[in-house]
Amino acid sequence: MINYFKKYFKNSPTKQAFLQKNLIPFDLGKMIRVGNNKDGGYVVSENGIKSCEFLLSIGLGFHFSFEKDFLKLKKSDSLLIESYDNSVSKKIMREYSTQNLIRLFFRPSFKTFQRSIRYFEFLLLFNSSKAIHVEKNVSEKKSENSETLNSIFQYLKQNNLVKIDIEGGEYILIYDIINNFNKINILIIEFHNLSNLENREKLDFFFEKVSEYFYLSHLHMNNSNGVSVDNFPDTIEFTFEKKCLLKTNVKKKLVNFPLDKLDYPSSKSTGDYNLIFK
């Protein structure tokens, strides 16, 4: 069983059995990392990402290495990426890079240099015909500054990779995600604020639904937010891949995490969390 969940569920055999059954990933063949070796990179199966023709990215922030790598993997001149995030724009990116450029003169570092050119990377990515950034959030209700997931999926075709990292906003999208399983090949999603018991119940509910149609291929504890007082990780990253696209004799993968040369700590200031399955 997983060391980080033992303590919380030691008096609940039903939940412990559920987690033991579902949180052990399946062996879907060769796994690759898409994105950088820190926060913003995720692990998927090589065969799974080949099946994806389009990336719907919900939550961008200042890290878009995943989106850049997705473009490199796809050889097409058509639109490949649509990203939603109201917290970033060309203006915000320009100000962010300018501040770091000034800082670079006084306290030079490679990290500051990387941040100083982020605006130009943003322009290169989203000024092309292959990727667009929509300055709206994705929520349960449509408004001037937000779009609904259902309305986005209405015009999307099949074979999509959906990546969701919206700092706790994922919970209000759970039902919309479930309603559109048929258009998703791979779902990468971060669940935040799991120190909140209500959020853990929502995660349990989602797992029951997603496990009907998808295999869990990977999970990783985001070490940026630590663990709660009962030793439960506050943020977990999940990769789910559609069952019908894969061979039928898929088995659980009894390996320990993090995976060497695939998993990296989200924050370099502290060590990565271990998941012990064997």
Residue ranges, per PLM feature:
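Conserved SAM/SAH-binding loop
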Residues: E135-E147, I166-G168, Y175
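SAM cofactor-binding core of SAM-dependent methyltransferases
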Residues: F26-E144, N193-S195
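Short amphipathic alpha-helical surface micro-motifs
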Residues: T14-K15, L23-D27, K38-D39, T112-Y119, ...
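Short, flexible coil/linker elements and helix-boundary hinge sites characteristic
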Residues: F9-K10, N22, F105-K111, Q154, ...
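Short N-terminal helix-initiation segments at or just after the protein's N-terminus
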Residues: M1-I2, Q20-N22, R103, S128-A131, ...
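Rossmann-like AdoMet
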Residues: M1-N36
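Conserved acidic-Pro-Pro-aromatic motif
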Residues: C52-L56, F66-L80, I92-E95, S151-K278
